[in-house]
């Protein structure tokens, strides 16, 4: 038995809105038409999906199971239509690459430039994402490859370290360490480290704090209020320090100084992708980045 993708799309809207009224408005359907679509889908599947009440709509266990598969199913269908239309128009194959703020746009561009995949036969689309968005965007096929500073891929995804970048220190131009050509991690014992996400939630934050502990001190740290911005900008307007991968020297129009960190310490760039997908282009890209 085949699934009617229109009904699946209707179901996803109901599941996400938890309301027939809001879902109908989102789909630009009448509530009666949407209700009929949901009843028809339940008949086709032979199981109830929704618990309907005056307070709204809740998913039954069967509905939760269908929703988990429906989102990537719709994304795959949309992607398939896009690929077919691009092929018909003779347009290049599209590979969508997401990256978190800790892997800067400049670093992504430098890694991609000159790869076999970067040719006129391929279109590379780069998208900036927050760390907690990356896994979901891979699962729903919004992106094909995710680049992050994580040490392991999100649950249910495959991953490979494709690069390592040297860590350095970023401080405000007026900071007491700004005149230094190089610092060591123990030099930061009295400083407040600005990180991009909370410890215990972000693997990269845990990695950076772990490096400080290995250097012999428990780091004071705080999370930047500016989410989605490059790490080098997180020291603007405060006296904190940030561990970054930018080149040494002035940054952010001279408002920030990037200082060498000794001895040399590197952090990974992890490429992640879906286990249930096959892409020769993605394989070439990952192999090229790792070489």
For each predicted feature, which ranges?
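Short helix-boundary/capping micro-motifs
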Residues: 12-30
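A short LG(V/I)-centered, amphipathic sequence patch enriched
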Residues: 42-59, 64
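Central regulatory/effector-binding core of bacterial HTH transcription factors
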Residues: 92-154
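Flexible hinge/capping segments at coil-to-helix
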Residues: 159-167, 171-193, 283
């Amino acid at each position: 038995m085949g699934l009617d993708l229109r009904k699946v799309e209707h179901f996803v809207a109901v599941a996400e809105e938890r309301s027939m009224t809001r879902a109908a408005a989102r789909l630009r359907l009448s509530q009666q038409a949407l209700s009929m679509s949901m009843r028809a889908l339940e008949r086709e599947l032979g199981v109830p999906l929704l618990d309907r009440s005056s307070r709204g709509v809740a998913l039954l266990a069967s509905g939760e199971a269908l929703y988990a598969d429906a989102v990537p199913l719709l994304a795959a269908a949309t992607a398939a239509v896009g690929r077919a239309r691009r092929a018909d128009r003779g347009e290049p194959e599209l590979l969508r690459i997401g990256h978190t703020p800790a892997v800067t746009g400049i670093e992504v561009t430098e890694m991609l430039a000159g790869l076999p995949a970067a040719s006129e036969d391929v279109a590379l689309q780069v998208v900036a994402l927050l760390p907690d968005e990356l896994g979901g965007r891979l699962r729903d096929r919004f992106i094909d490859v995710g680049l992050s500073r994580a040490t392991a891929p999100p649950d249910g995804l495959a991953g490979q370290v494709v690069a390592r970048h040297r860590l350095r220190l970023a401080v405000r131009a007026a900071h007491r360490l700004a005149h230094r050509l190089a610092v060591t991690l123990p030099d930061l014992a009295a400083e407040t480290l600005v990180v991009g996400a909370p410890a215990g939630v972000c693997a990269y934050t845990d990695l950076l704090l772990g490096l400080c502990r290995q250097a012999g001190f428990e780091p004071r740290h705080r999370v930047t209020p500016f989410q989605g911005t490059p790490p080098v900008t997180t020291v603007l307007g405060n006296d904190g320090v940030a561990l970054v991968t930018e080149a040494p020297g002035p940054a952010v129009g001279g408002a920030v100084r990037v200082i060498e960190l000794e001895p040399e310490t590197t952090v990974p760039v992890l490429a992640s992708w879906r286990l249930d997908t096959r892409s020769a282009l993605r394989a070439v890209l990952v192999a090229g980045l790792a070489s």
